[in-house]
């Protein structure tokens, strides 16, 4: 493996077609992965998360960074299922980005529980994470999965999730980033 460090100025061009073409010419064997990993292959791979046995779930929840996982889940879901994403970032841009990647409408993304933004935490989130892990013996990390479950539990407490619904919560990992 060869790592090549680039300047901030070069990084600003990470999505420019000319810059990407230059990289492809310099490194013809390279596979260039976009920041966050969302591309057609990521969506295809994430669509394989759901199996025929998952057809009975009414609500499928996942954490959202750049939109690849949720888009794959949306593509694999059937119209009676709702896919609910919990964004690690503040802003409606993710809704726009995901809408560009799918024609389906059985999904939503909330940024209400992003706790200030990407990789940011609150004392409440960290307390929830600690209590959840102690009770359920499932490790979480503070960037994505803890925010998703914190938000889901808050929505259940507030009566926003129908208790009769059958839920599937996707734990997408990220444990290497634990503090």
Regions found by a protein language model. Name each.
Residues 13-15, 54, 83, 146, ...:
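Terminal helix/beta-alpha structural elements that buttress the NAD(P)+-binding lobe
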Residues 2-4, 83, 140:
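Hydrophobic beta-strand scaffold residues
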Residues 31, 59, 166-168:
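Structural motif
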Residues 154-179:
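Short, amphipathic C-terminal "tail helix"
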Residues 41-116, 170-179:
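Glycine-rich phosphate/pyrophosphate-binding loop at beta-loop-alpha junctions
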Residues 1-55, 108-128:
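Small/polar-residue-rich loop-to-helix segments that shape phosphate-bearing ligand pockets
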Residues 110-113, 118-163:
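Active-site-adjacent helical/loop segments in soluble small-molecule enzymes
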Residues 19-22, 48, 52, 72, ...:
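Alpha-helical scaffold segments in soluble metabolic enzymes
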């Amino acid at each position: 493996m060869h790592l090549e460090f680039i300047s901030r100025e070069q990084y600003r061009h990470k999505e420019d077609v000319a810059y990407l073409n230059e990289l492809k010419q310099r490194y013809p064997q390279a596979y260039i992965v976009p920041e966050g990993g969302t591309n057609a292959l990521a969506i295809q791979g994430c669509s394989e998360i759901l199996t025929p046995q998952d057809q009975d779930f009414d609500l499928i929840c996942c954490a959202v960074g750049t939109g690849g996982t949720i888009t794959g889940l949306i593509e694999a879901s059937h119209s009676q299922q709702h896919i609910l994403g919990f964004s690690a970032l503040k802003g409606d841009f993710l809704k726009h980005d995901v809408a560009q990647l799918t024609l389906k409408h059985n999904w939503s993304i909330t940024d209400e529980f992003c706790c200030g933004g990407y990789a940011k935490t609150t004392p409440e989130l960290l307390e929830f994470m600690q209590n959840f892990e102690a009770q359920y013996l499932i490790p979480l990390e503070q960037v994505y999965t803890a925010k998703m479950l914190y938000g889901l539990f808050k929505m259940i407490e507030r009566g926003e999730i129908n208790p009769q619904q059958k839920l599937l919560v996707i734990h997408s990992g990220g444990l290497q980033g634990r503090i």
